[in-house]
Each structure stands twice: as structure tokens, then as C-alpha cells.
Amino acid sequence: MNLEDYQKAGVDIFDKLHLDSYPISIKYIRDLENEIPAGVRRPIDSGEKMSICQAFTYARRFKQKLCITSADNFCTPSSVGHGWVPLSVKEFTESQIRQKWSKDVQAEKRRAEHIYASNFKNVIELAYRGVIVSPLMETPVIPDSIMIYCDGPKLTYIINALNYEHKRKYRIQSTFEGFGESCSKGGFMPFVTRKAQIVIPGTGDRSFAGIQDHELGIGMPGSFIFYVLENLFQTGSGQGLKFPLRQLLPKLDENLTPGFRYMREVIDKKMNEAK
């Protein structure tokens, strides 16, 4: 697939699902001198700092094209988590202990063992130095990952599409922590693991990026968008899962409440008297 195919896919998924914001193209880069396309802005060049989740919001709501690096990013844990700076596991763990995200030192060490310690060195050795973020329909680069924010029913349609053939490649495998949800699970983990990830926006997303209470999300390897479009709305073969969502409506009568029932009796009496 070429760049135009991805841009068209961005338009198609936006239109078909009636999304409230644009799907996001995410591209990881190693060479800051040569891999940033014309028209892509670095916040630091205008004296700003910006987190990755904020860049996602600017891309999906305002169609901005941005490059975030360690120098641009005030959210230092995400710079470390993406391998942009060569901190040690010990140093990163100490920063998280000082943040008091976990109950105590032992809790944070258990978190490290479970979440990030085993792959810490591998991520740094990937040698990425930044990320290009843009609306998919106007992306200047072929994306490594695509992130879509949406409400619950629309997310269900995407999940149905990915699971339509139950192929191992497209299975969704997610864990949840409440931190680094959009930047990590929406972009970096799908790129590294080649697996789609459900995103429940976390602490930083809610605090920094203006994500609404009803919004959820999904991150996927870039090429998965074509599989989603191919299978969108196929699940159920018309049995209530088309768009907009078809929901069962209860069959009710006036016996639902005492007031309804009384009013029906009065109406019927008056109608009979008028005959």
C-alpha cells in the first residue's frame, strides 16, 4: 500500500464510523535531521513543550502535523519508555517511586518486573529518537501505527472487524495499567509487538490531553486499517450490528406505571362515552 492508500483509508474510516475526531498516523524515526518531512512542526522550535498524548489531540482535532522528541516532550517517562534517552532501569524506577504512582518501593519494583524491566534494554537498542504524529487522511508518511479514539459502540465495530476471521495476526492482546495508555498502547506497543491494543485513556491522557470522559481508543499496526475497513460491519450479517447501532426496544403498554394505567382508563372511559 502506498501513501495515498493510507490517506484514503483515513477518510474512509472517519466517514464510515462517523468518528468525532480524525484517526492518527504515528511514525517512529531515528534520524531527526533527515526523517522529518516538510510541514511537520517541532514544538521546541517555537519555544513550546508538548507531550505525545497532547500531540495526538492536536493531530486528531486540529489536523496539526507534529514531531515529538525527548527535547520537545515534557512527559519524561514517555521519552524513556520509547527508548529516546539511555536511562537505566534503576534510574527510571527511582523516578516512578518519587512520583508515588505505586504504594511503596516494593510495589514499584513489582511493577517494573511485570511491565518494563525485561524489555527496557531492548527498547533503548531500537534507537528511535522521535515520533511523527498527523491526521491519517493527511499523513506525510506511511504510518507504523494508527490510533483511533472513539466511543464504546464504535470501538466494538472495530473489534468485531479485527476478530471477524479470528486470525492470530489480528487478535487483540491488552493489559491495563492506567499510565502511558495512548502513547504506549496506542502507538509504540502496536508497532513493536505487531498486535492491536485497546486503550483506556490513562492519568496523563485525561490530565494533559483533553480526552473526554466517554472516549476510548485502539492502537494498531498501520497496515491493519485496511483489514478493519474490509470487515467493518460484516459481523452479524445484518442482525442488529450495522451502523448506526441497532438496539432492541422493549414492547411496553400502559401498565408500566400506575399513572400511565390510570390515564389510559380515563382516556378509554371518555372515548367510550363520546361514541
Annotate the PLM regions.
Residues 4-275:
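Acidic, serine/proline-rich low-complexity intrinsically disordered regions
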